[in-house]
Regions:
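Flexible phosphate-sensing "switch/lid" loops adjacent to ATP/NTP-binding sites
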Residues: 1-329
Length: 329
């Protein structure tokens, strides 16, 4: 499901693996025909994040950079359009040796090639690949097919993590697991079984719900990770550690931690909590309004830069939005 925090969950998972002494890189696979995000409306798509080599991509790439303390490149981003463009260019250059080039297997094979290439370039122990969109969408089926093929090729080196939302309807007051059950069944129909489920919700996951997800989704209770809303996103890696997410990941790959370097991240979160003296900062922009809603996603990196600068000075930033179009009139 879009907008539930898959990007932050990916970045946070990478952070806890970094804290264990492993090298990590991250990729985003967007299910758009657009070759990159440069032509997309920021109100609809959110911020267009630009990598150091000029690639215009999804805002989640910014979260990866901030959490992993790394500079990512065009090799860390792909769209359906970009993958198709690459395959067609290879066909024109006769790189397929006269074969009939088909959607399957050639498109998923190009996706897999890009994932492995990102690992080689970063010399990474872990490559975290976020597949955008929602399970069941026809747009991301080729990325799911690539995941299936990769897991079939290297079952001991591939893990599938499902980020699923568990709603708590106000009129009922009870957390519902049905959307997660259906998401897993849709994955099963694509030949995939999640190894871990990150259960997103407004409140922590309780034991009865964990057991229910375990039974209906064919997964160990220990691999159902509670991922409730946090006061600020940089708290999420610490929440994942409390849920022993890194332990479950390393167990899957039969690895042991190299280090325990969580102190620096704890210090960051402590500084954020202690930054209480407010400072007002205005941001002038035009990509705010979408129907009846006011969104700030178009300026995500600006917002995060302001927050980090304020926290460094032990201040709590209070951001005010100034619509440039109103002042132009």
């Amino acid at each position: 499901m879009s907008g539930i925090g898959k990007g932050v969950a990916t970045a946070s998972s990478g952070r806890i693996l970094l804290n264990k002494g492993f090298t990590v890189t991250a990729m985003k696979a967007d299910p758009y025909i657009n070759v990159d995000a440069g032509t997309m409306n920021p109100i609809e798509h959110g911020e267009v994040f630009v990598t150091e080599d000029g690639m215009e991509c999804d805002q989640d790439m910014g979260n990866y950079e901030r959490f992993l303390n790394a500079s990512l490149t065009k090799d860390n981003y792909m769209t359906t359009g970009l993958v198709y463009q690459t395959v067609i260019a290879k066909e024109r250059n006769l790189e397929y040796g006269g074969k009939c080039v088909e959607v399957v297997p050639h498109i998923p094979e190009e996706v897999i090639r890009r994932i492995k290439n990102a690992a080689l370039i970063a010399k990474a122990d872990f490559v975290l690949v976020e597949i955008g969109g929602t399970v069941g969408d026809y747009q991301n089926m080729l990325f799911l097919e690539a995941a299936r093929m990769l897991k079939l090729q290297e079952p001991s080196r591939v893990m599938l993590v499902l980020v699923s939302y568990l709603p708590v309807p106000k009129m009922v007051g009870e957390m519902k697991t049905k959307p997660t059950q259906h998401a897993v069944r849709l994955l099963n129909s694509a030949g995939l079984q999640p190894d871990i489920i990150l259960a997103r919700s407004i409140v922590p996951l309780d034991e009865p719900r964990k057991r229910k997800i375990s039974v209906f989704c064919n997964i160990s209770e220990k691999d159902v990770i509670s991922a409730p809303d946090a006061k600020f996103i940089y708290q999420i890696p610490l929440n994942f550690e409390k849920e022993k997410l890194s332990e479950r990941i390393l167990r899957k790959f039969r690895l042991k931690p190299k280090t325990e370097a969580v102190g620096e991240w704890e210090a960051l979160c402590l500084r954020i909590v202690r930054s209480k003296k407010p400072v007002k900062i205005g941001i002038v922009g035009k990509y705010f309004e979408t129907g009846s809603f006011i969104l700030s996603d178009a300026y995500l990196s600006v917002i995060e830069a302001i927050k980090h600068a304020a926290w460094h000075l032990k201040r709590k930033p209070i951001i005010h939005w100034l619509n440039a179009e109103e002042y132009e009139r």
